[in-house]
Amino acid sequence: MAVEKDQQKDAEAEGLSAATLLPKLIPSGAGREWLERRRATIRSWGSFVDQRRFSRPRNLGELCQRLVRNVEYYQSNYVFVFLGLILYCVATSPMLLVALAVFFGACYILYLRTLQSKFVLFGREVSPAHQYALAGGVSFPFFWLAGAGSAVFWVLGATLVVIGSHAAFHQIEAVDGEELQMEPV
């Protein structure tokens, strides 16, 4: 009995941390592994937003160098900035929330229906891929009315501006051995 309670507490503690950092809605597989790797390689948010480390680049060469190095160094942070902008866009657009609810509701209904029996339409069995395509087709008018196309381009534009600005103006750390070395001619 005591062992079961300890295991349950461990599972709850483990589930709590996983629930706060990684949604359980993401199925195990390639997507979850990718997100776990991103979360594991995330850099310190303190150094990411440290205002003392922002300055104007001296020339175009330094700007390009900063862009490349910062995108490489803060890649995981930038992924989470992108995901945050997506969540912001969805949360501030009620019609987009309705369209997403219709789409995911249709997918869930199809999922439950396939657990009970195979889906037959006009005497033919419909594959799961075609069923989800049908759910997307049914949801398409809702996405169109919600302005999902403009939301996608808003997210892409905002991401490019935020990440591009950060990468361009955030000073890169000097790493030993990567200094510019002059060779005699």
UniProtKB/Swiss-Prot annotation:
Highest taxon in the source lineage: Eukaryota
InterPro entries: Prenylated_rab_accept_PRA1
Major subcellular site: membrane
Pfam short name (any one): PRA1
Role description: General Rab protein regulator required for vesicle formation from the Golgi complex. May control vesicle docking and fusion by mediating the action of Rab GTPases to the SNARE complexes. In addition it inhibits the removal of Rab GTPases from the membrane by GDI1.
Homology family: Belongs to the PRA1 family.
Record-given protein name: Prenylated Rab acceptor protein 1
